[in-house]
């Protein structure tokens, strides 16, 4: 209707201007009432919302910083754990090598000791055998000498004496 009045040039009925004044007055009254009763509450709600958003942003930033810090600490702990594991492995290898070296030395010493003992035992047995042979030869020599002194030997008697003595030696060795 207003458009027709402006475009066509018709005169507007008087009710349109009155309606505009009433609507404008009602709008002003509504604005004043809103300002007096509701504007403070609306501004408070908007302020609270703004503060909440700001707090949420701050909280998100703090969470991001805390997460970055925790990630850095986790990385440091991981590196520390890896270095500790490498140190433990290194120590275990060194300990194993030391144990191996110690066992090798002990085994070598034991083998050397056993060889030396065997040499000593063999030497002692040989000395005892030689001593025994010497004693037997001496006894045999004394027995032969005693038999010779007791008898006057002719070549046949001498041969018979040697044969009997050899037989007695054979019997003595068989009994041992």
From Swiss-Prot:
Transmembrane segments: 14-34
Annotated membrane topology: Single-pass membrane protein
Molecular functions (GO terms): proton-transporting ATP synthase activity, rotational mechanism; proton-transporting ATPase activity, rotational mechanism
Keywords, in A-Z order: ATP synthesis, Cell membrane, CF(0), Hydrogen ion transport, Ion transport, Membrane, Transmembrane, Transmembrane helix, Transport
One Pfam family hit: ATP-synt_B
Main location, first listed in the record: membrane
Compartments in which it is found: Cell membrane
Entries under InterPro entries matching the protein: ATP_synth_B-like_membr_sf, ATP_synth_b/b'su_bac/chlpt, ATP_synth_F0_bsu_bac, ATP_synthase_B_chain
Domain of life assignment: Bacteria
Record-level GO cellular component terms: plasma membrane; proton-transporting ATP synthase complex
Keyword Cell membrane set for record: yes
UniProt xrefs under Gene3D superfamilies: 6.10.250.1580
Family from the record: Belongs to the ATPase B chain family.
NCBIfam families per UniProt: ATP_synt_b
SUBUNIT field: F-type ATPases have 2 components, F(1) - the catalytic core - and F(0) - the membrane proton channel. F(1) has five subunits: alpha(3), beta(3), gamma(1), delta(1), epsilon(1). F(0) has three main subunits: a(1), b(2) and c(10-14). The alpha and beta chains form an alternating ring which encloses part of the gamma chain. F(1) is attached to F(0) by a central stalk formed by the gamma and epsilon chains, while a peripheral stalk is formed by the delta and b chains.
Purpose: F(1)F(0) ATP synthase produces ATP from ADP in the presence of a proton or sodium gradient. F-type ATPases consist of two structural domains, F(1) containing the extramembraneous catalytic core and F(0) containing the membrane proton channel, linked together by a central stalk and a peripheral stalk. During catalysis, ATP synthesis in the catalytic domain of F(1) is coupled via a rotary mechanism of the central stalk subunits to proton translocation.
Protein name: ATP synthase subunit b
Species of provenance: Enterococcus faecalis (strain ATCC 700802 / V583)
This protein's encoding gene: atpF
């Amino acid at each position: 209707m207003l458009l027709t009045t402006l475009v066509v040039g018709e005169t507007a009925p008087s009710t349109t201007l009155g309606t505009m004044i009433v609507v404008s007055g009602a709008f002003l009254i509504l604005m004043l009432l809103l300002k007096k009763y509701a504007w403070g509450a609306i501004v408070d709600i908007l302020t609270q919302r703004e503060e909440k958003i700001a707090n949420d942003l701050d909280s998100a930033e703090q969470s991001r910083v805390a997460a970055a810090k925790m990630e850095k600490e986790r990385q440091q702990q991981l590196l520390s754990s890896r270095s500790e594991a490498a140190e433990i492995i290194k120590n275990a290898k060194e300990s194993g090598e030391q144990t191996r070296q110690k066992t090798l030395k002990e085994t070598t010493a034991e083998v050397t000791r056993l060889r030396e003992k065997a040499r000593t035992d063999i030497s002692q047995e040989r000395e005892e055998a030689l001593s025994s042979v010497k004693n037997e030869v001496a006894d045999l020599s004394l027995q032969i000498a005693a038999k010779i002194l007791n008898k006057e030997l002719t070549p046949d008697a001498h041969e018979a004496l040697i044969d009997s003595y050899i037989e007695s030696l054979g019997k003595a060795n068989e009994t041992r």
